Amino acid sequence: MALSAEGSSGGSRGGSPKAEAASVPSWPQILGRLTDNRDLARGQAAWAMDQIMTGNARPAQIAAFAVAMTMKAPTADEVGELAGVMLSHAHPLPADTVPDDAVDVVGTGGDGVNTVNLSTMAAIVVAAAGVPVVKHGNRAASSLSGGADTLEALGVRIDLGPDLVARSLAEVGIGFCFAPRFHPSYRHAAAVRREIGVPTVFNLLGPLTNPARPRAGLIGCAFADLAEVMAGVFAARRSSVLVVHGDDGLDELTTTTTSTIWRVAAGSVDKLTFDPAGFGFARAQLDQLAGGDAQANAAAVRAVLGGARGPVRDAVVLNAAGAIVAHAGLSSRAEWLPAWEEGLRRASAAIDTGAAEQLLARWVRFGRQI
């Protein structure tokens, strides 16, 4: 068997905070609770994030909030409030332009391993398999090349606004929401986050704030202790999502060892151990997945989509299949193991038939013609 259950939960980790008398939130009140290792009262995280997004929080307050919440350990309710406020300030895609079954393939980053851009390659493969993909991403924060950097090196336009991303999704089957373009109000937190230089609760927000709001996805989390928190946020949204953490530390499904999956469906979370060997994947070495700068990673994309075999292709197929499984989970009729078998078949076929390579060419051409 490739999968074994380890437990389940119904969403938010850490329980509900104690009720407290209604009062106007303030930074001393919120920071005091966090430094006292207490969960925030309902609405306090939302207030803090709104202060940050509107430019009313000072850098010291932003930094103190991010670090204190991280040290306390955030709950799904708190992170859900942060993400909800961030989405309320985002530029949305036009109404009725995102298919109900669209998926995202994205990770938190921050695993410190600097692999090739597996989620970016997987997203292209998933779209070529016929699943609409609206990917949210950014430039590199700690690695040599983020998803946006690699797409740009491939010739994909990463700077498109909501209307053109919607057109790309409709005409090509995939669209890319460049985080700074869609979340301009986040610039206040982004600068502080760079200066802090260590992972905080803000690292969780990218995968939770896709402005297209897809209902399904494969979401990588580099932080094993926070993956369940992310899963709880998706459960509250009743999304069909696989939150994944490679047991080697990757924010992807890994082929070097087992991965842990938090399967989100129908508002609940199940924790599973996933072994790709159960589906015939050979064990890889981590250095076989190593990436480089944007040009090197773009070359790796072209090689895999062009049919090159080996550990990188295996990891891409595995992650693309995971996204297809999450997509299948939108149907109450989906069965877990058959969905994996079908996902792996479709992902492999998308590469082997040339469909993924052709989709990338169409995506590049779309950007040149607009």
Swiss-Prot record:
The modification N-acetylalanine is found at A2. Binds 2 magnesium ions per monomer. Pathway: Amino-acid biosynthesis; L-tryptophan biosynthesis; L-tryptophan from chorismate: step 2/5. Anthranilate 1 binds at G107, N138. It catalyses: N-(5-phospho-beta-D-ribosyl)anthranilate + diphosphate = 5-phospho-alpha-D-ribose 1-diphosphate + anthranilate. Its cofactor is Mg(2+). The keyword Transport does not apply. The keyword Metal-binding applies. 5-phospho-alpha-D-ribose 1-diphosphate binds at residues 107, 110-111, 115, 117-120, 135-143, 147. Catalyzes the transfer of the phosphoribosyl group of 5-phosphorylribose-1-pyrophosphate (PRPP) to anthranilate to yield N-(5'-phosphoribosyl)-anthranilate (PRA). This is Anthranilate phosphoribosyltransferase. It comes from Mycobacterium tuberculosis (strain ATCC 25618 / H37Rv).
